[in-house]
From Swiss-Prot:
SUPFAM superfamilies assigned to the protein according to its UniProt record, in alphabetical order: Cysteine proteinases
Cited InterPro entries: Papain-like_cys_pep_sf, Peptidase_C92
Further comment: Displays sequence similarity with a group of bacterial permuted NlpC/P60 proteins. Thus, the ancestor of the OPG091 gene might have been acquired from a bacterial source at the onset of poxvirus evolution.
Phylogenetic classification of the source organism: Viruses, Varidnaviria, Bamfordvirae, Nucleocytoviricota, Pokkesviricetes
Entry keyword set: Host cytoplasm, Late protein, Virion
Gene Ontology cellular-component terms listed: host cell cytoplasm; virion component
Source organism: Variola virus (isolate Human/India/Ind3/1967)
Pfam families membership: Peptidase_C92 (PF05708)
Family designation: Belongs to the orthopoxvirus OPG091 family.
Role of this protein: Contributes to virulence in host but not to replication in cell culture.
Protein name (record): Protein OPG091
Superkingdom of this protein's organism: Viruses
Principal cellular location given in the protein's record: virion
Compartmental location: Virion; Host cytoplasm
Length: 165
C-alpha cells in the first residue's frame, strides 16, 4: 500500500510522517537520517492535510497528496495515546506562518513536531550540535514511545493489525 492511502485509511490525527525526497536542496546539510517531517492534521472539508515547515514557506498546511510529491521513502509513527496526538495536531495550526529557521521565533520541521508534542505533554530529547540543541528524526525514531506503523522500505502488515486493535 502506498503511504498516502495508508495514512488516509489508518493513520490517526497527529501521526508524524518522515519523508525523504528524490530532490532536496537541504538534504546534504541535514544530519538527520530522515530528511523531512510533517504532522498529519487529519481532514478538513474532505481534504487530508499535513502541517510542515519548509525553508521556502515556513510553517504551512498542505494537502497530503502534495506533501508526497517527489517522495523517495516514507515512515509514519504514532503514540499509544490518541488524545495526545490530537492535541499536537491542533497545536500545529497555531504555529502556521512562523518563518523557517533555527533561531528564536523560527521553526524547522523537526522543531515544529517537537514543539507541538511538548504542548501536548510529550517532551523530546535533542542533540547538541555546534553548541545548539537541535531536533533530528532520530530524536523521535529512537524513542520507544513512538510506534512505527508504516515504512515504505519495509512493508509489513503487522502494523495494520496493530491499528485495528
Amino acid at each position: 500500500m502506498d503511504p498516502v492511502n495508508f495514512i488516509k485509511t489508518y493513520a490517526p490525527r497527529g501521526s508524524i510522517i518522515f519523508i525523504n525526497y528524490t530532490m532536496s536542496l537541504t538534504s546534504h546539510l541535514n544530519p538527520s537520517i530522515e530528511k523531512h517531517v510533517g504532522i498529519y492534521y487529519g481532514t478538513l472539508l474532505s481534504e487530508h492535510l499535513v502541517v510542515e515547515s519548509t525553508y521556502r514557506k515556513g510553517v504551512q498546511i498542505v494537502p497530503l497528496d502534495s506533501f508526497f510529491e517527489g517522495y523517495l521513502s516514507a515512515k509514519v509513527y504514532m503514540l499509544e495515546n490518541i488524545q495526545v496526538m490530537k492535541i499536537a495536531a491542533d497545536t500545529s495550526l497555531t504555529l502556521l506562518g512562523i518563518p523557517y529557521g533555527f533561531g528564536h521565533n523560527r521553526m524547522y520541521c523537526f522543531k515544529l513536531v517537537a514543539e507541538c508534542y511538548k504542548n501536548a505533554g510529550i517532551n523530546t530529547s535533542s542533540k547538541r550540535i555546534l553548541g545548539k540543541d537541535i531536533f533530528l528524526s532520530q530524536n523521535f525514531t529512537d524513542d520507544n514511545r513512538w510506534i512505527k506503523i508504516y515504512d515504505s522500505n519495509n512493508l509489513t502488515f503487522w502494523q495494520i493489525d496493530y491499528l485495528k486493535g
